[in-house]
Curated annotation (Swiss-Prot):
It comes from Methanosarcina acetivorans (strain ATCC 35395 / DSM 2834 / JCM 12185 / C2A). GO terms for molecular function: ATP binding; GMP synthase activity. Keywords: ATP-binding, GMP biosynthesis, Ligase, Nucleotide-binding, Purine biosynthesis. It catalyses: XMP + L-glutamine + ATP + H2O = GMP + L-glutamate + AMP + diphosphate + 2 H(+). The gene is guaAB. NCBIfam families: guaA_Cterm. Coiled coil: none annotated. The keyword Glycosyltransferase does not apply. Pathway: Purine metabolism; GMP biosynthesis; GMP from XMP (L-Gln route): step 1/1. This is GMP synthase [glutamine-hydrolyzing] subunit B.
Length: 305
């Protein structure tokens, strides 16, 4: 286990050595990984750091406004790039290709911002499980295997690449980051794109965004899952009134885990599952069916793609 009191000064010193001069930008998503990296980098290089938040259009409901509020003290720059990401994802159905499309667009947007502020370095919140899954061929991550082969940065700096998620949280508490950040549930780098099986469209995004909001609202505080979310699997036949309806199938996922390397599905009470189904199908008319995924990791991964 990490000892934050030893890790923090070493990480700050390492960043200082890797970025001796010039400016750096960081992909600040508001998740615990990027938030810890931003705080470490700020302590290491001060105002030579420019935190940037990219609104990909693949974010959770209300995400951008929350992040702007929480990090307003850090001179956060927000880039609205939804059109670029949806254009890159148009027609893409393969999960790996989707991740790489998001990763490449992600980097290109950052390169544009880096040129604008003359930044030489990119700081990223890659953690150890990301590297293991990418190197093992399980799935690429937008900040590991999903990166394009040619980048316009002098160097990519990854201050927490040897830490597990629970260790990152310990460091976050030691850095005195807000509780909302320290205990924030993991959210995939490619965002809602990997919670949509098949091509990403505006309609699917609308459905999965609202379904995720309902699932988090119902399960987070009551059951404290390590991760919980909804995914759009495809379409199925349902009934609305007396009429056949062809609508979306939404899968609900809720797991317990220590570090994300293994996970078990939560045994949610039947009445909770029925309530989730009722809310999702009534509040999102385009949904015809709701299912609950009980598969552990392994054999499944936590996310569907």
């Amino acid at each position: 286990m990490v000892k934050p009191e030893k890790f923090i000064p070493k990480a700050i010193e390492k960043i200082s050595q890797e970025i001796k001069e010039g400016k750096a930008i960081i992909a600040l998503s508001g998740g615990v990984d990027s938030s810890v990296c931003a705080e470490l980098a700020y302590r290491a290089i001060g105002d030579r750091l420019q935190p940037i938040y990219i609104d990909t259009g693949l974010m959770r409901k209300g995400e951008t406004e929350r992040i702007k509020h929480i990090f307003s003290h850090m001179n956060l720059h927000v880039v609205y790039a939804k059109d670029r990401f949806l254009e890159a994802l148009a027609g893409v159905t393969d999960p790996e290709e989707k991740r790489k499309a998001v990763g490449e667009t992600f980097i290109r947007v950052f390169e544009d911002e880096a040129k604008r502020i003359a930044a030489d370095y990119l700081i990223q919140g890659t953690i150890y499980p990301d590297r293991i899954e990418s190197e093992g061929g399980i799935k690429s991550h937008h900040n590991v295997g999903g990166l394009p082969s040619v980048m316009d940065f002098e160097k990519i700096v990854e201050p927490i690449e040897d830490l597990y998620k629970d260790e990152v949280r310990e460091v976050a508490w030691a850095l005195q980051l807000p509780e909302e950040i320290c205990e924030r549930m993991p959210f995939p780098g490619p965002g809602l794109a990997v919670r949509i099986l098949g091509e990403v469209t505006e309609e699917k995004l609308e459905v999965v965004r609202e379904a995720n909001f309902i699932v988090e609202e119902e399960l987070l505080e009551r059951f404290c899952p390590w991760q919980t979310f909804a995914a759009v699997l495809g379409k199925g036949t349902g009934v609305k009134g007396d009429i056949r309806a062809y609508g979306w199938i939404v899968a609900v996922r809720a797991v317990g885990s220590r570090d994300g390397m293994t996970a078990e599905a939560l045994e949610l009470p039947w009445e909770v599952l029925k309530h989730l189904e009722a809310r999702i199908t009534s509040e999102i008319p385009k949904v015809a069916r709701v299912v609950y995924d009980i598969t552990p990791k392994p054999p499944a991964t936590i996310e569907f793609e």
